[in-house]
Amino acid sequence: GNGTKLTWGGLAQGLDLVVSTARLNQVIDHAIGDMTLTAQAGVIVSPLQAQLAEHQQFLAVDPAYPAQATLGGVVATADTGSRRQRYGGVRDMLIGISFIRYDGQLAKAGGRVVKNVAGYDLMKLMTGAYGTLGVISQLTFRLYPVQETSRTVVLSGPATELRPLMATLGRSPLTPVAFDLLSPALAASLGLKAEFALAIRFQAIAPGVTEQVERLQTLVPEPLTPILLTDQDDQTFWPQIQAALFPDPPRDATAIVVKLGLRPTAVVDSLECLERLAPDLALGCVHATSGIGTVRLTGDLATVAVVEALRSRCQEWGGYLTVLEAPKALKQILDVWGYSGNALPLMQALKDQFDPYRRLSPGRFVGGL
């Protein structure tokens, strides 16, 4: 694609040739009535979304670097943002895939019909594999209708106030499309108070959104004052979160960006820990219900010690920390993936089956695969 995520994951080893899919940039089929899209891997996300919006549809991904990110790169890195709350991860909307095997042969799975589940496991396998099992060439996604109305409620305050509110909202009948906890530094960068902030977005027909916002306000305890973002403020707020975590072009070559995966019950703990390790400076956003988040460390805080301390706590909570972006010198020191599970033999067996000669993205995945 456009190489926006070539620096993600482990450092490539024994690299002889870089193959680009940037010129595989055509939309093959947009079945408006079926709400599916088939496109080549090099199609860029932002202009595609504009094209789909003409038909009141959209692809439910909000990846890093959307103005440059391609569909193939999004799938290869399983990269999506706050929309995961409502629509799931990349693999949940992928219904068909074509890829080039290590021997140059074309392989396919799934199809262009939402109900078609053939090759379901293979599509999940390719999602997030960082190109180590095949070169993605074409993809088919399910699409969703653009909602009539969108509103965002932001609540700022201490973690002690937000923690019980998050638990209450999680048990409530509310159906937000995004539900994120932001670190104080990230909140401040967005023009909010330099406190922990809970951002909740609702999208539906106008009466439905109004009702949900009103229900939410009845659940908010006295010390917290909701801020309601409407219209343009709502539309720009969420892209600003991604732009703060993944500035384009990058403003700091020494920054470290990591991905967290936690139980939802540890979301508040993770950002409290981050605040102790890097007070007032680390940018962090964690999705409240999936427990997946992103942290950006800059300047003197972008150190191996801070990353390892945060990773240690994540593992204590039953989660993980993966280094996405970091200077090469630090990646040579850090264990990028920090994987401590028991599935490595299975991953090695899959690599042996799909790429026995280690030709595809060697060294970028878990365990140096």
Predicted regions and their residues:
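Short cationic amphipathic helices and targeting signals
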Residues: L37-T38, R151-L155, F196-G208, I256-L262, ...
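Conserved glycine-rich FAD pyrophosphate-binding loop
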Residues: N2, G9-D16, A22, P66, ...
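Short, conserved charged micro-motifs
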Residues: P47, T160-L165, A206-E214, A266-E272, ...
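N-terminal glycine-rich flavin-associated loop
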Residues: S20-A67, V75, D79-R112, V117, ...
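C-terminal substrate-binding/cap subdomain adjacent to the FAD-binding core in PCMH-type
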Residues: A76, I95-P250
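Short glycine-biased active-site loop of nucleotidyltransferases that positions the nucleotide triphosphate
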Residues: L6-A12, S189-L192
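Structural motif
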Residues: D16-V18, M35-L37, Q57-A60, V74, ...
